Amino acid sequence: MTMLLTAEEVKQLALKESGELAGVAAVNTFPTSVPSRPPQAVLPGAKSVIAYGIPMLLGSISSNPRVAASHTKTVYDELNRIGYQVGRLLERAGYHAATVGSFFPLEMSKETRGLVGDLSFRHAAVAAGLGVWSRCRLVLNPRWGPRVRYAAVVTDAPLASDSPSEEELCADCDLCIRACPVGALSTEGTVDTIKCLLQVQQYGQPGFSRFLRDLVAKPIEEQQQALRQPLFWNLYQHLAMGIDYECSRCLEACPVGL
């Protein structure tokens, strides 16, 4: 038996739990991401997606990579906590709810190469009216620009949906494109995901794989020496943290919300 639960009650809980943004998108109008990750694949019978977001601290993401990565992990942990509370509210009312991890785990397959989550939080945020697309496929919020991390809860509760924003926020200033140190962003609006990944996650899975490949080819003495080098220490630290972000240049450069 289900209890009456309004979209406003659900959004207010997300805001009360320290989220700054919350909105609802209907599953039947949910935009298609590439590759397709429909909400029904997360929860069969899904009717609504509750998207919510937390702004990042500009001082933290503009600091050194250690401070920025630690801050990002803090925000992701908070997003997971909020999602669980929203899910509990929905299930206490008799509905089903599924939270999607804000970072890991990801599908590790030949098809996705660990680049695709079970649900696109950016598409959820845009569909729920929390932001609009930028030229380089960041989600822009009028108050915080692209400096917001999003997450979502999928539910079979038939909640009233919000309308996508029609506000034009991206001025095509090219500041994000010029700020990218590896040229991953283009004026045509495309993103070279691999270039971006190798810059953002220098000590992530690609870097770890290269280290192992090179390590096994070395003589035993050189292997032992490699384990006493800062490269291995950084790889270990990032594996232990479970998160790896070494670059926020495009987020810092965007003038929206500053």
Question: Residue ranges of each PLM-predicted region?
Answer:
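Non-catalytic, usually N-terminal nucleic-acid engagement modules in DNA/RNA processing proteins
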Residues: 1-81
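Catalytic cores of enzyme domains
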Residues: 33, 74-258
